[in-house]
Design a protein with these regions (language model features):
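Active-site helical microenvironments for divalent-metal-assisted chemistry
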Residues: 1-191
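Single conserved hydrophobic/aromatic residue that forms the stacking wall/gate
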Residues: 192-203
Length: 203
């Protein structure tokens, strides 16, 4: 039961509607229990039953290939099957928690899930505007696909951050001064993106 709760928590953090959260809690019900769509309709609502059924259909899809040239077609197929965008959102949260617990899988299964995640689910999350989930998916997949490369990039990033920290601070201070001089009140934040994972996905 911990997996559905974790998926629901991920979606709650995204401030999604109640029906989506309930769907997250029930998303494995049709697949893993004897409960049917009709029973979910009776116990909850037709809306939630449709969403759970949609997630089940996506889960049952066989992603036999994640070659880059075919990944876009797979993403389009997922979007076409999911008549309600919330089905995709639940599936993305489901995949995120699967990746967070991926160490429990056999090595070959880890590689399969990581490739699917990098080629299909992470770009799909970006397309849906869920950038934080996209970055988390990319990072978790990158750990599996190229653990040593990821560690090397992080090490280099830390060095560059130390070397350029003063320069970055001066730039942000100058920007802040210019904004204040123009009568604009603003807060400047630095955002570090997962470009390493983006690069890996095109290798």
């Amino acid at each position: 039961f911990s997996h559905p709760v974790a998926v629901a928590e991920i979606l709650a953090e995204q401030q999604l509607d109640d029906a989506t959260i309930v769907t997250a809690l029930l998303h494995d019900t049709i697949e893993d229990t004897t409960s049917s769509k009709d029973e979910i309709t009776k116990q909850f609502t037709p809306e939630i039953a449709d969403l759970v059924d949609g997630v089940t259909k996506l889960t049952n899809m066989q992603l036999t290939s994640t070659e880059t040239k075919e990944a876009e077609n797979v993403r389009k197929l997922l979007m076409a099957i999911a008549q309600d965008v919330r089905v995709i959102l639940v599936k993305l949260a489901d995949r995120l928690h699967n990746m967070q617990t991926i160490k429990s899988m056999k090595p070959e299964k880890q590689l399969q899930k990581a490739r699917e995640t990098m080629e299909i689910y992470a770009p799909l999350a970006g397309r849906m505007g869920m950038q934080s989930i996209r970055q988390d998916l990319e990072d978790l997949a990158f750990r599996v696909l190229n653990f040593e490369g990821r560690a090397s990039i992080i090490k280099r990033f830390v060095v560059l951050q130390k070397e350029n920290g003063d320069v970055i601070q001066r730039i942000t201070d100058d920007m802040h001064s210019e904004l204040e001089a123009s009568g604009i009140r603003a807060t400047i934040c630095l955002l570090y993106t997962s470009d390493a994972a983006d690069d890996w996905s095109s290798v």
